[in-house]
Protein backbone atom coordinates (compact mmCIF):
# COMPACT_ATOMS: atom_id res chain seq x y z
CA UNK A 1 0.00 0.00 0.00
CA UNK A 2 2.85 2.39 0.76
CA UNK A 3 4.33 1.79 -2.69
CA UNK A 4 0.99 2.59 -4.36
CA UNK A 5 0.73 5.80 -2.35
CA UNK A 6 4.27 6.84 -3.32
CA UNK A 7 3.64 6.10 -6.99
CA UNK A 8 0.38 8.06 -6.89
CA UNK A 9 2.13 11.01 -5.27
CA UNK A 10 4.90 10.98 -7.90
CA UNK A 11 2.35 10.83 -10.73
CA UNK A 12 0.34 13.68 -9.22
CA UNK A 13 3.39 15.91 -8.85
CA UNK A 14 4.51 15.03 -12.39
CA UNK A 15 1.12 16.01 -13.77
CA UNK A 16 1.18 19.30 -11.86
CA UNK A 17 4.62 20.15 -13.25
CA UNK A 18 3.74 19.10 -16.80
CA UNK A 19 0.47 21.08 -17.01
CA UNK A 20 2.08 24.57 -17.15
CA UNK A 21 4.68 23.32 -19.64
CA UNK A 22 1.91 21.95 -21.85
CA UNK A 23 0.00 25.23 -21.61
CA UNK A 24 3.11 27.17 -22.60
CA UNK A 25 3.75 24.72 -25.44
CA UNK A 26 0.27 25.16 -26.88
CA UNK A 27 0.53 28.90 -26.27
CA UNK A 28 3.74 28.88 -28.29
CA UNK A 29 2.11 27.14 -31.24
CA UNK A 30 -0.92 29.47 -31.13
CA UNK A 31 1.45 32.46 -30.91
CA UNK A 32 3.38 31.15 -33.93
CA UNK A 33 0.17 30.66 -35.89
CA UNK A 34 -1.61 33.91 -35.00
CA UNK A 35 0.87 36.47 -33.64
CA UNK A 36 4.40 35.89 -34.94
CA UNK A 37 3.63 37.21 -38.42
CA UNK A 38 3.49 40.73 -36.97
CA UNK A 39 5.13 40.49 -33.55
CA UNK A 40 7.94 38.18 -34.70
CA UNK A 41 9.13 34.92 -33.19
CA UNK A 42 11.02 36.89 -30.52
CA UNK A 43 8.22 39.39 -29.79
CA UNK A 44 10.25 42.39 -31.00
CA UNK A 45 7.92 43.13 -33.96
CA UNK A 46 10.86 43.28 -36.38
CA UNK A 47 9.06 41.21 -39.03
CA UNK A 48 8.24 42.90 -42.36
CA UNK A 49 4.52 42.89 -41.49
CA UNK A 50 5.22 44.16 -37.98
CA UNK A 51 7.33 47.03 -39.31
CA UNK A 52 4.77 47.91 -41.99
CA UNK A 53 1.91 47.96 -39.48
CA UNK A 54 3.88 49.61 -36.68
CA UNK A 55 3.21 46.64 -34.37
CA UNK A 56 4.29 47.28 -30.81
CA UNK A 57 7.16 45.21 -29.45
CA UNK A 58 5.93 42.82 -26.78
CA UNK A 59 9.02 43.83 -24.80
CA UNK A 60 8.01 47.52 -24.85
CA UNK A 61 7.87 48.73 -21.21
CA UNK A 62 4.19 49.68 -21.59
CA UNK A 63 3.33 46.16 -22.75
CA UNK A 64 5.45 44.55 -20.03
CA UNK A 65 3.73 46.69 -17.36
CA UNK A 66 0.22 46.05 -18.73
CA UNK A 67 -1.94 43.79 -16.60
CA UNK A 68 -2.91 40.33 -17.78
CA UNK A 69 -6.52 41.55 -17.95
CA UNK A 70 -5.55 44.46 -20.22
CA UNK A 71 -3.51 42.25 -22.55
CA UNK A 72 -6.27 39.63 -22.62
CA UNK A 73 -8.73 42.36 -23.64
CA UNK A 74 -6.35 43.51 -26.40
CA UNK A 75 -5.99 39.97 -27.73
CA UNK A 76 -9.76 39.39 -27.61
CA UNK A 77 -10.91 42.75 -28.96
CA UNK A 78 -7.96 43.96 -31.02
CA UNK A 79 -6.41 47.42 -30.84
CA UNK A 80 -5.41 49.82 -33.58
CA UNK A 81 -4.37 47.70 -36.56
CA UNK A 82 -4.27 44.49 -34.49
CA UNK A 83 -7.29 42.30 -35.25
CA UNK A 84 -9.56 40.79 -32.61
CA UNK A 85 -9.02 37.11 -31.85
CA UNK A 86 -12.11 36.45 -29.70
CA UNK A 87 -13.75 34.33 -32.41
CA UNK A 88 -10.49 32.77 -33.57
CA UNK A 89 -8.95 31.67 -30.26
CA UNK A 90 -10.71 30.15 -27.25
CA UNK A 91 -10.27 31.67 -23.79
CA UNK A 92 -7.89 28.81 -22.95
CA UNK A 93 -5.83 29.50 -26.07
CA UNK A 94 -5.69 33.22 -25.28
CA UNK A 95 -4.51 32.38 -21.76
CA UNK A 96 -1.80 30.15 -23.27
CA UNK A 97 -0.71 32.87 -25.70
CA UNK A 98 -0.53 35.37 -22.85
CA UNK A 99 1.61 32.95 -20.79
CA UNK A 100 3.90 32.55 -23.80
CA UNK A 101 4.12 36.34 -24.29
CA UNK A 102 5.06 36.75 -20.61
CA UNK A 103 7.78 34.11 -21.08
CA UNK A 104 9.08 35.94 -24.19
CA UNK A 105 9.25 39.17 -22.22
CA UNK A 106 11.66 37.53 -19.76
CA UNK A 107 14.11 36.45 -22.49
Residue ranges and their predicted role:
Residues 74-75, 86-107:
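C-terminal capping alpha-helices of c-type cytochrome domains
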Residues 12, 51-54, 73, 97:
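Short, glycine/charged-enriched secondary-structure capping and boundary segments
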Residues 25-54, 79-83, 103-107:
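Periplasmic/extracellular electron-transfer cofactor-ligation site
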Residues 15-32, 46, 64, 70:
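Electrostatic cytochrome c docking/interface patches
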Residues 56-69, 85-94:
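Electron-transfer interface patches adjacent to heme c in soluble/periplasmic c-type cytochromes
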Residues 64-80:
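Short Fe-S-cluster ligation motifs
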Residues 1-24, 100-107:
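Post-cleavage N-terminal segment of exported redox proteins
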